[in-house]
Design a protein with these regions (language model features):
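Conserved "HGTGT" condensation-loop signature of ketosynthase/thiolase-family condensing enzymes
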Residues: 1-136, 142, 149-155, 164, ...
């Protein structure tokens, strides 16, 4: 079988409650700093202020698609920065995901955010093609998956794949509280809602060399699967969907065991149970499956932004020489059943 075209990351951008760029966000995560705080005015069903992680650089009065775009703009531009010194003009395909449709975030939200963000980015770069989806937690990784396919099919030279999410609409917070998903002293298995955006600029290794760009990481593989036994239902999850996503990923992967795992587990028991079963379904593929990182402990649950933000954590570790393993696995799961996983290798593997 012919060798597939190598996909590489040549730019990343991040904006989180911990920092307004990838470097500061990664440093805060590494130091274990938490941005979780009391909401200024929202009260939960126990009479306590809701625990959230918010972007303090954006006024709380800014809401809806406009808030999401304001969060997304700077990290998108950061991810594109490498093209500013490229040898020639480049055209970029934007693939964006937001959170799933929910109270406070109606149908059409993703399309609105995408259109507004495209308009802002068009002042700096030529955008061609792409798309948007309300993909939920797995959405950012789903964007990376589709970007890899787009690049390998020769439909674009560069893909800007990203996710942006914000849970801080009052209607959304009330809905989470009603569903017993908010973390509090009275509900230890809930999560702390956050807001963030993350982006990755992807291309083939051939194009990167043509443009004189230095790869930051190699995308060793990307996979998508579906889970039928979903959260907030009467069914029992046995890790079939996530286990399949891992299996698809490992089919064409190096035999080396995964040494670093970053995921979107957020305190909900469902996610922990699912991961445990998924690992059992893929024996021998992890150095230590119990040694995983959950950034939501620090920057809150950031939904669709999770995957691209995980990529930025690894690029920062590589850049500062504290990445200790050649293979990293990042994964996330949406409430709609979508499961996505990406396997990343260091820049040396792409050379």
């Amino acid at each position: 079988m012919a060798k597939r075209e190598t996909i590489v990351v040549v730019g990343t951008g991040a904006r989180t409650p911990l920092g307004f760029d990838a470097a500061s966000s990664a440093a805060a995560i590494r130091a274990g700093i938490s941005a979780i705080q009391d909401h200024p005015y929202m009260i939960d069903r126990f009479g306590e202020r809701m625990k959230v992680a918010r972007d303090t650089g954006i006024d709380m009065s800014l809401a809806g698609p406009e808030r999401a775009v304001e969060i997304a703009l700077s990290p998108a531009l950061d991810a594109l920065q490498s093209l500013a010194v490229a040898r020639q003009a480049a055209k970029v395909s934007l693939i964006l995901s937001t959170g799933e449709s929910r109270p406070g975030q109606k149908e059409g939200f993703a399309a609105q955010v995408s259109a507004k963000l495209r308009s802002r980015l068009a002042e700096h770069i030529v955008l061609e093609g792409g798309g948007s989806t309300a993909g939920g937690h797995a959405g950012g990784l789903l964007a990376i998956y589709h970007a890899c396919k787009t690049l390998r099919d020769g439909k674009a030279e560069f893909c800007l794949a990203g996710g942006v999410d914000t849970y801080l609409e009052p209607e959304t917070l009330e809905w989470l509280d009603e569903n017993e998903q908010l973390h509090s002293e009275g509900n230890i298995y809930g999560f702390c809602p956050g807001e963030a955006a993350g982006f990755c600029l992807l291309t083939t290794l051939t194009i990167a060399r043509t443009f004189g760009l230095q790869p930051l990481l190699e995308v060793v593989g990307a996979s998508v699967a579906s889970e039928e036994n979903r959260i907030k239902t009467e069914t029992v999850v046995l890790g079939e969907g996530l286990g399949a996503a891992f299996r698809f990923l490992f089919e064409d992967a190096p035999i080396d065991p995964v040494g670093r795992i970053i995921c979107d587990m957020n305190g909900e028991r469902y996610r922990g149970n699912e991961y445990g079963f998924a690992v059992i379904r893929n024996p021998g593929r992890f150095k230590d499956a119990a040694d995983f990182e959950t950034p939501a402990d620090c920057w809150g649950d950031v939904g669709a932004a999770s995957g691209p933000l995980f990529v930025s954590l690894i690029t920062e570790a590589e850049a500062r020489n504290y990445q200790r393993t050649p293979l990293s696995l990042i994964w996330a799961g949406s409430e709609n059943g979508t499961r996505a996983a990406v396997l990343l290798g260091g820049p040396r593997s792409a050379a």
